[in-house]
């Protein structure tokens, strides 16, 4: 499934990790139930709440036409106490 694009690490998302809430950007066409099912299946955790919001669009000018580049939304996933998602790290060479 390619609904989840990547995890987000901002000041707010790092603060929310203490409350067992994980933040990621997802495709705008994905539904909450799809993302919830995928997270529970892939990571083996229990999701109790999901919040999402659209980020402000960024404009990109192509000649006289103004286009927008943001085609995703941010999802905050709250897990049941006792569950956690291991950090996703890239292996450095």
From Swiss-Prot:
Keyword Cytoplasm: no
InterPro entries associated with the record: Nucleotide-bd_a/b_plait_sf, Ribosomal_uL23-like, Ribosomal_uL23/eL15/eS24_sf, Ribosomal_uL23_CS
An example molecular function term from Gene Ontology annotations: structural constituent of ribosome
Keyword terms, alphabetized: Chloroplast, Plastid, Ribonucleoprotein, Ribosomal protein, RNA-binding, rRNA-binding
Record carries keyword Disulfide bond: no
Pfam families reported for this sequence: Ribosomal_L23 (PF00276)
UniProt GO cellular component terms: chloroplast; ribonucleoprotein complex; ribosome
Family annotation (SUPFAM superfamilies): Ribosomal proteins S24e, L23 and L15e
Compartments reported by the entry: Plastid, Chloroplast
GO BP term, pick one: translation
Primary localization: plastid
Subunit structure and binding partners: Part of the 50S ribosomal subunit.
Similarity annotation: Belongs to the universal ribosomal protein uL23 family.
Function of the molecule: Binds to 23S rRNA.
Protein name: Large ribosomal subunit protein uL23cz/uL23cy
